[in-house]
């Protein structure tokens, strides 16, 4: 019993520490989406809504507001 409690405490500590280390190194936020990525996501969704659903083999050109064929070289 004592060993399992120690193991759980160790794993919890390692998980929390890893999250803080990642955030300190490159600014990641493991607690969910931050405001900037939510705004980017919403902007992306609005741009895609301009085109609607593009047919297979085409992509949404948000600037033009229409579907365009994918170029394959």
Curated annotation (Swiss-Prot):
| Example GO molecular function | toxin activity
**Stated name of the protein:** Conotoxin Cl14.8
Which range is the signal sequence, renumbered to this chain? 1-19
Task: Report, as the record phrases it, the tissue specificity of this protein.
Answer: Expressed by the venom duct.
Q: How is it modified after translation?
A: Contains 2 disulfide bonds.
Q: Which family does it belong to?
A: Belongs to the conotoxin L superfamily.
The UniProt transmembrane annotation reads none
**What's written under domain?**
The cysteine framework is XIV (C-C-C-C).
GO CC annotations on file? extracellular region
Q: Which chain positions lie within coiled-coil regions?
A: none
Location in the cell reads: Secreted
**What top-level branch of life does the organism fall under?**
Eukaryota
From which organism does this entry originate?
Californiconus californicus (California cone)
Mark which residues the record calls propeptide.
Answer: 20-47
> What keywords were assigned to this record?
Disulfide bond, Neurotoxin, Secreted, Signal, Toxin
Tell me yes or no: is Manganese among this UniProt entry's keywords: no
């Amino acid at each position: 019993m004592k060993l399992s409690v120690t193991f759980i405490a160790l794993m919890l500590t390692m998980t929390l520490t890893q999250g803080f280390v990642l955030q300190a190194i490159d600014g990641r936020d493991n607690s969910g989406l931050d405001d900037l990525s939510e705004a980017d996501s919403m902007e992306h969704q609005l741009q895609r809504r301009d085109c609607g659903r593009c047919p297979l083999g085409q992509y949404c050109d948000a600037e033009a507001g229409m579907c365009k064929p994918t170029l394959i070289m």
